[in-house]
Swiss-Prot record:
It is found in: Cytoplasm. Keywords: Aminoacyl-tRNA synthetase, ATP-binding, Cytoplasm, Ligase, Nucleotide-binding, Protein biosynthesis. It comes from Sulfurisphaera tokodaii (strain DSM 16993 / JCM 10545 / NBRC 100140 / 7). This is Valine--tRNA ligase. ValRS has two distinct active sites: one for aminoacylation and one for editing. The misactivated threonine is translocated from the active site to the editing site.
Length: 809
């Protein structure tokens, strides 16, 4: 029998209040130690027995800020990694950095005032800026408990080892006949001054105008067209109407004259014209939108270059030359009105093709004729639509987003960008548009600094020029799987690790990172890149809308990490179903900290009795212990199944029903008197149940569970090395379920009775319990526990239909 003095002495060793900051900083440093890396977190190349689990984690763009979206997937990645290690897998958990691209260039160009024309200095400063940003983001990730294998699997897309893989993959695609240089209309962002891929643009609703303009007919009369782009008048090559439109049937084939520019164009009939839009007559310009491109190709129309790289008008005989697009629109309206060609202007909202992906640009894009490098993508649409079905999507509905994107593809992938900070495209070209690849042994290289493999073009003899453009950043990040699994560098490792087990990412980059990785890996390896794709939803602001600085609803995960703890934040982020959007509120985090404080208190209460002690299973378990073990078995099995299905929400929710409501509020109270008496059944059961509980919770809340495991057990250097609990030996008995149900009912009923009669819980009372015969017989088996737990002098029983408690004098 333990004395109160002995218990109090032990309790002094366990702080009363859970201090997340102190505990978390301690364990984060321990996890980073060489010993823990070697024994816990290292991917063991030499291990030929354990199953392998490879996680393809997102390499975030190095902006310097770890926002809540980053915190979410970091938590998911770390949780999966820890669970799979507990499950016995040899886990490869990498972390890369998507380092190159326009945002960094703009920071260096405008904040540091470094001109990009000074290429060497500019690139040097881009790398320095990138490394500063990585340092900040890495520190934030570690503060959230994230533990990838920094030692060997941290990569940067600008580094030579990674760049070599990027360039080799491009040479391989060239050998397959999939890369070519050609001239034609491309998506162009005048603000960013670079070409874009189809995946980087999208439609945004913006305020606009619909101008109704008179076009005189050469033979007399007029046709009124409606356009949202009157500034493109000088580039108009034809007028189009629907061939079945009764208003214009007689005009098809006639000649219209462009006002102000006196240019003759033909009126054509085409089914793509919307009769209901505007007047049903439109101008075909080069180029106002994707439909103009289709018409130009279909009818072999001439082209006029009207807009330059900076979004200024040219080739209008001085009428609009030098004006920005918006300025030119206003000016042309004034001129048309002045000359009597303007019928009317309507203000309306319409969808404008804009630079939307991975950019805060959001500017309207234009179509400029440029010489660019393309990867042939469209020819693979059918194969992609078949092969994507081999990947399992979590949740399953996310597969349709990828399918829809593949079906919507209309353009090959333009991979060249008119920027500086990026992966050099390993090619030279001649004026006949012959593309010459670099030698593989020269990789990685910059063709602007390296001699070409030939003096002149081997196909036509013309001089060779280096490709000065850099690669689209999605070229960089689309080879993460190929890089990590050693496709080009380690065939033995590749066979062991490919395809990756799971890809983690958000919904916002399905049509970019997911699609490009899927496409490139399929073409290069002949296989899908990963077996599973886990796609998380968005973390919204507290008001339930998308986080935005302009709205003032942006929540930084580190703002209150010291106050509430990383584990509380992780519990909050994972208390939502994968794929769903959800609001993040600090009030919810506060609630999760209360849950962890409850866990801490339960550990402290248990410590004097089970701390660092071993207990053999007794031959006869107390009925209450049998009940809790049965509940425990279900909790463990249900949690493991939930983890396997990435249903972290289910694990978090079960902590409330199992730990809080059953273990803390019921079981611990019921066994206190037996703990004091050092009852082996109670000690064994509590020790087993609590260890398993910490193991199950560890992947989500690693700091507090590692600390409590170390205090209560400490058999191994990390709780991860314990492996998952095995509960198959626990027998299941439906009668024990009945016992548990009646215990909960009885304790709740008697506590309510005391509260209603304003009797403090520690004060003893006499009670009459009323209920069916089965209930009375069951409760009598644990009467002593009920009496000692609820401070009862005497219990009198009376049969009745309804279970209730009455106060006896």
């Amino acid at each position: 029998m333990l004395s109160q003095e002995e218990i109090n002495k032990k309790l002094e060793e366990w702080p009363k209040h859970y201090n997340p900051k102190e505990i978390e900083l301690k364990w984060q440093q321990i996890w980073l130690s060489k010993e823990y890396w070697e024994k816990v977190f290292r991917f063991k190349d030499e291990d030929e027995k354990s199953p392998v689990f490879v996680i393809d984690t997102p390499p975030p763009f190095t902006s310097g800020e770890l926002h809540m979206g980053h915190a979410y997937w970091v938590t998911i990645a770390d949780t999966i990694g820890r669970f799979k290690r507990l499950q016995g897998y040899n886990v490869l958990l990498p972390q890369g950095w998507d380092t190159q691209g326009l945002p960094t260039e703009l920071k260096v160009q405008y904040r540091l005032k470094i001109p990009k024309e000074n290429r060497e200095l500019f690139l040097k400063k881009c790398v320095e800026w990138t490394e500063d940003m990585i340092k900040k983001m890495k520190e934030a990730m570690i503060r959230l408990g994230y533990r990838p294998e920094w030692e060997r699997y941290e990569y940067r897309t600008y580094e030579n080892s990674y760049r070599k893989i990027i360039q080799k993959s491009l040479l391989e695609m060239y050998k397959l006949g999939l890369i070519e240089i050609r001239e034609g209309p491309v998506y162009w962002c005048p603000k960013c001054e670079t070409a874009l891929a189809q995946s980087e643009v999208g439609y945004l609703e913006k305020d606009g105008i619909l101008a109704y303009i008179r076009f005189p007919l050469k033979d007399g009369g007029e046709i009124i067209i409606a356009t949202t782009r009157p500034e493109l008048l000088a580039a108009t090559q034809a007028v189009a109407v629907h061939p079945e439109d009764e208003r214009y049937k007689g005009l098809i084939g006639k000649i219209a004259i462009i006002p102000l520019f006196n240019k003759e164009v033909k009126i054509i009939g085409d089914d793509a014209v919307e009769k209901e839009f505007g007047t049903g007559a439109v101008m075909i310009s080069t180029y106002g939108d994707p439909q103009d491109i289709k018409w130009q190709l279909k009818y072999n129309l001439p082209t006029t270059e009207l807009i330059d790289e900076k979004g200024r008008i040219k080739n209008t005989n001085g009428l609009l030359d030098g004006l920005k697009i918006e300025e030119a629109r206003k000016k042309i309206i004034e001129l048309l009105k002045e000359k009597g060609y303007l019928v009317k202007i309507e203000n309306f909202k319409h969808n404008v093709l804009s630079h939307t992906e991975r950019s805060d640009c959001l500017s309207p894009i234009e179509f400029l004729v440029k010489k660019q490098i393309f990867i042939k993508t469209l020819q693979f649409k059918d194969k992609l639509l078949e092969e994507y079905k081999k990947m399992k999507f979590i949740p399953s509905r996310m597969a349709y987003y990828l399918e829809d994107w593949i079906k919507s593809l209309e353009w090959d992938w333009n991979i060249s960008r008119q920027r500086v900070y990026g992966t050099p495209l390993p090619f030279w070209y001649c004026d006949n548009n012959h593309l010459i690849p670099a030698r593989e042994e020269d990789l990685p290289l910059d063709p602007t600094k390296t001699k070409p493999p030939y003096e002149k073009c081997p196909q036509c003899g013309l001089p060779l020029k280096p490709v000065t453009d850099v690669a689209d950043v999605w070229i960089d990040s689309s080879v993460t799987v190929i890089y990590l699994t050693g496709f080009y560098t380690d065939k033995r490792k590749f066979e062991k690790t490919f395809p990756a087990s799971v890809r983690l990412q958000g919904t916002d980059i399905i049509r970019t990172w997911l699609f490009y990785t899927f496409f490139r890996t399929l073409v290069l390896t002949g296989n899908i890149p990963f077996k599973e794709v886990l796609i998380n939803g968005q973390v919204l602001g507290p008001d339930g809308t998308r986080m935005s600085k302009s709205k003032g609803n942006v929540v930084n995960p580190l703002d209150k990490v010291d106050e509430f703890g990383a584990d509380s934040i992780r519990l909050t982020l994972l208390d939502a179903r994968i794929g769903d959007d959800f609001p993040f509120k600090w009030e919810t985090v506060r609630g999760k900290k209360l849950l962890l404080q409850k866990l801490w208190n339960a550990g402290r209460l248990s410590y004097p009795f089970i701390g660092k002690k071993k207990f053999d299973r007794p031959s006869n378990l107390h009925p209450i212990d049998r009940w809790i073990l049965q509940e425990h078995k279900r909790f463990v099995k249900k949690s493991i199944e939930a983890y396997n299905n990435y249903d972290f929400y289910q694990v978090v929710e079960s902590l409330y029903s199992y730990f809080w409501e059953t273990i803390a509020d019921e079981y611990l109270e019921l066994i206190k008197h037996r703990l004091f008496a050092e009852d082996l059944s109670a000690l064994y059961t509590l020790s087993r149940v609590f260890k398993d509980l910490l193991i199950i919770l560890h992947p989500i809340a690693p700091h507090i569970t590692e600390e409590m495991y170390n205090r209560l057990y400490g058999d191994k250097i990390s709780i991860i090395l314990e492996g998952l609990p095995n509960v198959d030996d626990i027998e299941e008995d439906p009668n024990i379920d009945t016992l548990g149900k009646y215990i909960k009912t009885t304790t709740s009923t008697i506590r309510t009775l005391k509260i209603q009669n304003r009797i403090p819980i520690p004060v003893s009372i006499n009670v009459k319990l009323v209920g069916p015969k089965e209930y009375i017989e069951t409760i009598k088996r644990v009467e002593d526990d009920i009496i000692k737990t609820l401070k009862i002098e005497k219990i009198v029983y009376e049969e009745g239909e309804e279970i209730k408690a009455e106060l006896l004098s």
